[in-house]
């Protein structure tokens, strides 16, 4: 039986990346909540950037 989680980095970036979060109002709400909480990584796309 094929399992539900079939990871692909491109799909991950496109769905949960910074640009897709900024594209919607609720996505921006997510980012601001994560900033307020003091998260080290805001999105999955910030994991491999130079900003670490």
Swiss-Prot record:
What keywords are assigned to this protein? Ribonucleoprotein, Ribosomal protein
Please indicate which superkingdom the organism of origin belongs to: Bacteria
- Keyword presence, DNA repair: no
User: What are this entry's molecular-function GO terms?
Assistant: structural constituent of ribosome
Q: Answer whether the UniProt record assigns the keyword Lipid metabolism to this protein.
A: no
Q: Name one Pfam family in it.
A: Ribosomal_L34
Under the cellular component aspect of Gene Ontology, which terms does the record hold? ribonucleoprotein complex; ribosome
Q: Please list where the region (Disordered) is annotated.
A: 1-52
The processes (GO biological process) annotated in the record are: translation
Which residues fall in a compositionally biased region of kind Basic residues?
1-19, 26-42
Per the record, where are the segments of Polar residues compositional bias?
Answer: 43-52
Q: Which PANTHER family match?
A: LARGE RIBOSOMAL SUBUNIT PROTEIN BL34M (PTHR14503:SF4), MITOCHONDRIAL RIBOSOMAL PROTEIN 34 FAMILY MEMBER (PTHR14503)
Protein family (similarity comment) = Belongs to the bacterial ribosomal protein bL34 family.
**Stated name of the protein:** Large ribosomal subunit protein bL34
- The scientific name of the source species is Chloroherpeton thalassium (strain ATCC 35110 / GB-78)
Name of the encoding gene: rpmH
């Amino acid at each position: 039986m094929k399992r539900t989680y079939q990871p692909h980095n491109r799909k991950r970036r496109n769905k949960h990346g910074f640009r897709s979060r900024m594209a919607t109002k609720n996505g921006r709400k997510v980012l601001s909540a994560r900033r307020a909480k003091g998260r080290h990584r805001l999105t999955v796309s910030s994991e491999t950037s130079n900003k670490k």
